[in-house]
């Protein structure tokens, strides 16, 4: 699997080495995160087909709601971010893993007003 050069993080496309989280990020200590695993397939005509991308993005948001996390992006924005990430990395096929998590801020079981990062 090739290394990705770019990662979409909190609404911005970043060089992968700049996409970092603080060591006291709530999700690292309490598992306060949700994710999806999405497969993109290369097509014979040179394009990509991403399997049920919109459904995956909606499910990510619904999973976050179950955990009382408010994802700061719409499903449509997440769909665009996944496609943009594949294009930025020049990947006609691959595995996309959107992740939303409670970021750095208050520690303890209840994260209070910590940001939800995606």
Model segments located where?
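Conserved alpha/beta cores of soluble small-molecule-handling proteins
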Residues: 1-118
């Amino acid at each position: 699997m090739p290394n990705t050069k770019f990662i979409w993080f909190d609404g911005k496309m970043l060089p992968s080495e700049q996409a970092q989280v603080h060591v006291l990020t709530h999700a690292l200590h309490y598992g306060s995160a949700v994710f999806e695993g999405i497969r993109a397939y290369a097509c014979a005509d040179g394009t990509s087909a991403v399997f049920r991308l919109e459904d995956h993005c909606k499910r990510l948001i619904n999973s976050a709601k179950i955990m009382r996390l408010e994802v700061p992006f719409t499903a449509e924005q997440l769909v665009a971010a996944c496609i943009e990430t594949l294009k930025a990395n020049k990947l006609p096929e691959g595995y996309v893993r959107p992740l939303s998590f409670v970021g750095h801020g208050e520690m303890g079981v209840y994260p209070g007003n910590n940001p939800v990062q995606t």
